[in-house]
């Protein structure tokens, strides 16, 4: 098996699984209980907060554990809307045209005004257009405190946004910046203070944790309402804490600290993969200068649909995708590819390769050899 779909989900790391099982088997107390069996789980949660906060340049009390990226995204948006409504302000949200489906679905199903700001053909946000939208709504809605929600790195094409500049624009108009860092976390350095991030969503299963754990960073002073009510986590996120999964995420973050050569290693592998893809007639999508090192979006300019190539590769034990896993069953072309001005035909011919941290050069070469063979087979069937 050669797994090249890491952006969909990463394989849980052995040491992370061991940590999870340890807390399932031996330290299973309820952290909210006054009994002695609960002391260790409660203490571990505090240590996990401190470890994560230190990794992103935050304070421990600014970290709130959730079930994952989608919950964190929805909480940031709905919590903002509910709080603004409660204090008699008009909630207004600006997002880019290439956001994750959890953001788009949230905007389209909640009672709030929102607008989309465009991206260029590389998937980079037009900063002038963004400022124009924020300026216009701030002028029209007096006292408006807009929420701008932006992916740090896109999950389909890997483009990384200039969050520092976006933050400067947002704060110039007294807005709040929420960043979806689900794909970026663990793949690039993130310091929320340096970047000027007010809220940030993260999901554990993108960096070696099991599915079902994540967190929302909320900068001290940012006011949003809870999404799930209860007494836990200072009343901000109810529900008994998922102790084993929090322990697993703490372990995964500690491992990220140790992998100091990730960028160098992954860029070498990425460049080799891209060279092989270009030899087969693919063009590469996304920003050539500002991108994650592990995501490659590639369009084949031959009469082969991505779904057919994905199926053929699957039968060979090589796993790739056509884009976001959360939208893999859609019959419509990717909204991300449409946003970067790709036509429907090319969108249906686009694949995504995302490299796990432990992939080898030999595995990439083997996968590319198999892909070349499968493309030739598919073309011969059409002849």
Task: Set out the residue ranges of the language-model regions.
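Pyridoxal 5′-phosphate
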Residues: 1-383
């Amino acid at each position: 098996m050669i797994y090249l779909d890491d952006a969909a989900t990463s394989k849980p790391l052995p040491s992370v699984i061991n940590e999870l099982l340890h807390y399932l088997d031996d330290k299973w107390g309820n952290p909210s209980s006054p009994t002695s069996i609960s002391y260790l789980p409660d203490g571990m949660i505090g240590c996990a907060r401190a470890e994560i906060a230190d990794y992103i340049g935050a304070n421990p009390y600014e970290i709130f554990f959730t079930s994952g990226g989608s919950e964190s995204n929805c909480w940031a948006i709905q919590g903002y809307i509910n709080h603004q409504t409660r204090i008699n302000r008009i909630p207004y949200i600006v997002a880019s045209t290439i956001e994750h489906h959890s953001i788009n679905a949230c905007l389209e199903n909640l009672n709030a005004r929102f607008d989309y700001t465009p991206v260029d053909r590389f998937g980079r946000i037009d900063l002038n257009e963004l400022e124009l939208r924020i300026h216009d709504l701030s002028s029209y809605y007096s006292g408006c405190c807009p929420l701008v929600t932006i992916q740090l790195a896109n999950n389909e094409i890997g483009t990384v946004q200039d969050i520092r500049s976006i933050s400067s624009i947002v704060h110039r108009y007294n807005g709040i910046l929420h960043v979806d860092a689900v794909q970026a976390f663990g793949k690039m350095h993130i310091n929320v203070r340096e970047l000027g991030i007010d809220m940030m969503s993260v999901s554990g299963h993108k960096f070696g944790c099991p599915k079902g754990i994540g967190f929302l960073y909320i900068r001290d002073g940012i006011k949003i309402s809870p999404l799930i009510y209860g007494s836990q986590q200072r009343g901000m996120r109810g529900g008994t804490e998922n102790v084993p999964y929090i322990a697993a995420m703490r372990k995964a973050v500690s491992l990220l600290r140790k992998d100091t050569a990730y960028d160098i290693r992954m860029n070498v592998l990425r460049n080799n993969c891209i060279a092989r893809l270009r030899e087969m007639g693919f063009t590469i999508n996304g920003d050539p200068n500002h991108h994650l090192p592990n995501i490659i979006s590639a369009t084949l300019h031959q009469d082969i649909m991505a779904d057919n190539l994905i199926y053929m590769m699957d039968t060979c034990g090589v796993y790739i995708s056509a884009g976001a896993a959360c939208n893999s069953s859609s019959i419509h072309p990717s909204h991300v590819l449409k946003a970067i001005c790709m036509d429907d035909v090319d969108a249906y011919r686009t694949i995504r390769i995302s490299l796990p941290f432990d992939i080898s050069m030999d595995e990439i070469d083997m996968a590319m050899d198999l892909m070349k063979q499968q493309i030739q087979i598919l073309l011969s069937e059409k002849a």
